[in-house]
Swiss-Prot record:
Keywords, sorted A to Z: Cell wall, Cell wall biogenesis/degradation, Disulfide bond, Glycoprotein, Glycosidase, Hydrolase, Repeat, Secreted, Signal
One Gene Ontology molecular-function label: polygalacturonase activity
SMART domains: PbH1
Function: May function in depolymerizing pectin during pollen development, germination, and tube growth. Acts as an exo-polygalacturonase.
Active site: D233, H256
Biological-process GO terms, alphabetical: carbohydrate metabolic process; cell wall organization
Single GO cellular component term: extracellular region
Cysteine pairings via disulfide bonds: C235-C252, C364-C370, C393-C409
InterPro entries linked to this entry: Glyco_hydro_28, PbH1, Pectin_lyas_fold, Pectin_lyase_fold/virulence
Gene from which the chain derives: PG9
Highest classification ranks of the organism: Eukaryota, Viridiplantae, Streptophyta, Embryophyta, Tracheophyta
Protein name (database record): Exopolygalacturonase
Class of the enzyme per the UniProt entry, highest EC level: hydrolase
Repeat positions for PbH1: 192-218, 219-240, 242-262, 272-293, 337-364
Glycosylation positions in this chain: N89, N246, N349, N387
Length: 410
């Protein structure tokens, strides 16, 4: 009986040893991918090389697959180094909350054949509670391909890849990172809700084509704060169907200013409403704060409840500009009145200098005039000597209080 007990005990210990040993081996396999508790995935442990030359796309995609498939809080670590990657597709929904910690630099491949038709560089789809943070760069390496941009010459041009695209992303955050030299737009949000963009830097030369800083469309609850943007197009552009946007503490320049639009180019565009821009500075921009809609627009929509306050202009051209006959690069063929209604727009405490005599231009149409415009303490003066500060107001109705007498439209 004792022999039988000893044999059973030995067999039990052997089985226990195998189980424990197997768990250790499995743990080793996990640790090869995870650099910390709760699922922290370092791309260098998945084969990424930070030499700026080796293609690390596969490693980054594998990190995403692991993080998105894990429960709880997951982190993808981009450590210091230069990581060359092609098109990245981060698709959800994810089982847990994912943070992408960008301490190093991601470099977009300049080989356009690696991007699918209408493809973007980093495309994030249907992911909630996503955080992209860190002090690293998302470098689109645009200078290598900007010469292939035909959008300044052709109305229906082939669009180069945008850098960071977020579609159907809710309750997300982008903070701390620098977006650099995108091939086209630096950041684009479509049908996103409750997004926070803070402490971000967006940089491209002032003459780089279509390098908008941050664009959004059909989105709501977007906050952009403490952000510095200098690009070759709009610093921030707010597209159709967007509402409840708060922009504060943004410095823009070079660039085309902070814009609503363009609007009316396509059918079935939706209204834009409840947009607040406050405590911002525009430095030597082509425009300051602007609303732009295509002449003879394809959609009937309304822009309303727009509030600009405490905006400082530093030698910006066209500081306040509403353009209902927008036609970029003179490539439009339409010659009719805009179907876009602009109403209830407030400009409060707008100060500084303009590099053009026209500090205010409200260019609305007789068929659909702009109404409810309020000019409250608008004091922007022409910085040149060959002309005087002036306002040009066509088919616009509203009120003026505390403004330079030269800027009294109403």
């Amino acid at each position: 009986m004792a022999c039988t007990d000893n044999a059973m005990r030995a067999l039990f210990l052997l089985v226990l040893f195998c189980i424990v040993h197997g768990e250790k081996e499995e743990s080793k396999g996990i640790d090869a991918k995870a650099s910390g508790p709760g699922g922290s995935f370092d791309i260098t442990k998945l084969g990424a090389s930070g030499n700026g030359k080796t293609d690390s796309t596969k490693a980054v995609q594998e990190a995403w697959a692991s993080a998105c498939g894990g429960t709880g809080k997951q982190t993808i670590l981009i450590p210091k180094g230069d990581f060359l990657v092609g098109q990245l597709n981060f698709t959800g929904p994810c089982k847990g909350d994912v943070t992408i910690q960008v301490d190093g630099n991601l470099l977009a491949t300049t080989d356009l054949s690696q991007y699918k038709e209408h493809g973007n560089w980093i495309e994030i789809l249907r992911v909630d509670n996503l955080v992209i943070t860190g002090k690293g760069n998302l470098d689109g390496q645009g200078p290598a391909v900007w010469s292939k941009n035909s959008c300044t010459k052709k109305y229906d041009c082939k669009i180069l890849p945008n850098s960071l695209v977020m579609d159907f992303v809710n309750n997300g955050e982008v903070s701390g990172v620098t977006l650099l030299n995108s091939k086209f737009f630096h950041m684009n949000m479509y049908q996103c809700k409750n997004m926070l963009i803070k402490d971000v830097t967006v940089t491209a030369p002032g003459d780089s084509p279509n390098t908008d800083g941050i664009h959004m469309g059909d989105s709501s609850g977007i906050t952009i704060t403490n952000t510095v943007i200098g690009v070759g197009d709009d610093c921030i552009s707010i597209g159709p169907g967007t509402s409840k946007v708060n922009i504060t503490g943004v410095t823009c320049g070079p660039g085309h200013g902070i814009s609503i639009g363009s609007l009316g180019r396509y059918k079935d565009e939706k209204d834009v409403t409840d947009i607040n821009v406050k405590d911002c500075t525009l430095k030597k921009t082509m425009f300051g704060v602007r609303i732009k809609a295509y002449e003879d627009a394809a959609s009937v929509l309304t822009v309303s409840k727009i509030h600009y306050e405490n905006i400082k202009m530093e030698d910006s051209a066209n500081p306040i500009f509403i353009d209902m006959k927008y036609c970029p690069n003179k490539l439009c063929t339409a010659n009719g009145a805009s179907k876009v209604t602009v109403k209830d727009v407030t400009f409060k405490n707008i100060t500084g200098t303009s590099s053009t005599p026209e500090a205010i231009s409200l260019l609305c149409t007789a068929k659909v005039p702009c109404t409810g415009a309020t000019m409250d303490d608008v004091n922007v003066e022409y910085s040149g000597t060959n002309n005087k500060t002036m306002a040009i107001c066509t088919n616009a109705k509203g009120s003026t209080k505390g403004c330079l007498k030269e800027l009294a439209c109403f």
